[in-house]
Amino acid sequence: AENFPVKHHLLKLVGKFSGQAFWGDERIDEETARNAMGILNDHIKFIGTQEDSVTIESILDQARILNFRYGLNGLIIDPWNTVEHKFRDSENETNYVSRVLASLNTFAKIHEIHIWVVAHPRKMESDNNRKVVVPTPYDISGSANFYNKADNCITVHRHKDEDEDYVGIHVQKIRFQYKNGYTGIGKLSYNIRNGKYGEYFKQDEKALF
């Protein structure tokens, strides 16, 4: 899977949490790393790390157990394309996606948790100027139900040209705007050393060339 083996993914999380990298100058020290790992271990549990294949059903079964033992605030399925998708007899992909997303929605409501599904677009499209178009949930392989069934949809997209280089946070759908905010775009910078996002400041012309 994209974030396996887990130890490598955990190291990335330690870097993000501490704000320090494991390489280069001013690298993270052992004490800081161990403290960060301890805190992360108290708050994050991994599902499906010892299995050859993971299905939505097995994820929810394990999440149910973890919720009983520890109490969960959220569940992240990342990424969608590494999950083994088992279709029922005569079930096409559109109906499968609709059924599975409905089951995730029901699980979230029953257990009062947030569920995030991280999914990649089929392919990146370009406009007439050969500029990459910001993908939407409709561009995810499988079904338009990724947009229709979700309460909220967010696209994280890198914008890079000769004038700017930033990460765009495109909030493309908010079902309950009266309490969860509105659609729109935010700009963030990305720190390649520690993997953290921060406030974006546009570079002036002298800094670009």
Question: What kind of region is each of these model predictions?
Answer:
Residues 1-24, 79-84, 149-151:
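Walker A/P-loop NTP-binding active-site region of P-loop NTPases
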Residues 10, 33-43, 72-82:
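A glycine-rich, aromatic-flanked flexible loop/lid motif
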Residues 1-3, 113, 117-122, 159:
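A short beta-strand-to-loop transition that corresponds to the Sensor-1 phosphate-sensing loop
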Residues 20, 24-27, 35, 57-75, ...:
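C-terminal regions of RecA-like/P-loop NTPase motor modules
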Residues 45-47, 116, 154, 186:
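Hydrophobic/aromatic beta-strand patches that form the interior of the parallel beta-sheet core
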Residues 56, 94-98:
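Non-membrane alpha-helical structural segments and their capping/turn regions in soluble enzymes
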Residues 82, 122-123:
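Signature of the SF2 helicase/ATPase Hel1-core->accessory helical subdomain module
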Residues 34-54, 122:
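Conserved P-loop NTPase mechanochemical-coupling segment
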